[in-house]
C-alpha cells in the first residue's frame, strides 16, 4: 500500500479533532466564564485569567459596565488565576487564585463593592434543576449593608409571623442553595434577626418551576437600603429596584417644639438639639408638613432619590424658620480601619460658621448655619478629642474628649444652642 494512503485515516482523525476544538458551545476540554458588574465604585471592568505555569495576563472579558452581565467567554478547562481590572487600566483590583474549571462547565463572577471595597463572588452555573414545582435559590449579599435576612411570603403575611427563607447572610458572602416551592411571592429583606429593620420590599417576584436562581442583593446610594437582582442559571439579569428613601429630622430652631411629617410619615417630634430616627418614605417629590410651637410653617415639596438618605434640618434666622435638605452619605469608609465624621450646623441663636477639628487637626471649616460639612475619613480609635470653634473668631464652642470612633462607622456631630448654651450631639448614623 502506498504510504500516502496509510496517512489518510490519521489525517481524518486530526481534522475531526481540530474541528471539535472550534465549537463555540464549549465542547469537551473547555469551560465558560462571564462577569456581572454590580460594583457602584467601578463603572467598567475587565476580566483576565492565566494558568499557574503562565504569568501572562490574558484578557477574556472586556468593558462590562455597571449593572450589566457579559456573554460567556470560552477557555480551555484547567486551573486559573482570575484577575479583575478597571477597563483600560493595567493595575489589578483583585486576584482570585487557583480556580479549577472542569470540562463543559459554566461559571459567573459577580464583581461588587464601593470604591476601595472591590470584591467578587463566584456562581457555578451547572446546578442540577429541582423537581417540577420547585425552585433552587441562592442569595448573594454584596450590598455592604451588614448581615441580611430574606423573606419570601404571601403578600399579606406580617414579618412577625414569618420565618426567613435565608437568614443571616453576611456582607460579601453567598448562602447555601435553598429549594422552595415555585410561585409568586412578596420579597422582603431585613437586617439580620430584626424583622422591623426593613431594607427592601418587592410586592411580587416569580420563581419558575425547575428554575435555579441567584438572588443578588446590592447597594443603594445612601448605604443602608438594598436592591435585588435575579440571575437565572445561564440567564440574564433582572433588577428589582428599591422605591424608598430614608429621611430624619433635626431641630436647630429655638422657636419651640417641632413636629415634622415627610411624605405623610412622621419623622420628628422634639425640641432644639433633637435628631430623629430615620424613617422610610416613597422616593420622588414628597410633601412636608411642619409645625413649630404649634404654628404651621410652609415648606416646599422635597425631592428624594430612591435609595438615598437625608436629614431635613430646621433652623432660624432673621427671616424666620428655615429648612435645609441635607444628603447623608452613610456608605462605608473607603478603607478598613477608618471611620467617617462630619459636622452639621444648627446653631440658630448664634449664626456663626463652624470649624471641626479632630485631635487638633481641622477637617471642616466655614460650615454655615443650616449646612453640613462633607464627611472626612479618619483612623478608628479611642480617646479622640473633637473641637468645634467659630471659624471667624477661633472661639471654642464645644470640646468632646475621650471619644471612640469605630471602624466602618459613620458619625454626625450636630451642633445646636438653647440661648447661649451650646451643645454638640454625636450621632452614629450607621
Task: For the regions a language model picked out, list residue spans one by one.
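Sec-dependent bacterial lipoprotein signal peptides
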Residues: 1-20
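Intrinsically disordered, low-complexity polar regions and short flexible loop motifs
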Residues: 22-430
